[in-house]
């Protein structure tokens, strides 16, 4: 073995298998770019992002951990969200939930 060497099996890994998802159209109505990380509670994102927040409650971006989506000013795009797992308890972010979903 060589330090840092990776042994990768053939095939694909499906992220968030079996979890509920929803696709929303999101528009940045602000004058600055907005970037949202993979595990940010999407319901609590920057108010300049316009979308159906009710459908985003308890959801996060359905992307690989540690990645993000950037919304340029005036840009609209469809994003897929996936339900949060675990205890489904939210603290922090913008302080809109602060407890159990």
Swiss-Prot record:
GO molecular function: urease activity
Protein name listed in UniProt: Urease subunit beta
EC number, as in UniProt: 3.5.1.5
Top-level taxonomic group: Bacteria
Pathway: Nitrogen metabolism; urea degradation; CO(2) and NH(3) from urea (urease route): step 1/1
Catalytic reactions of this protein: urea + 2 H2O + H(+) = hydrogencarbonate + 2 NH4(+)
Organism expressing this protein natively: Rhodopseudomonas palustris (strain TIE-1)
Ranges in coiled-coil conformation: none
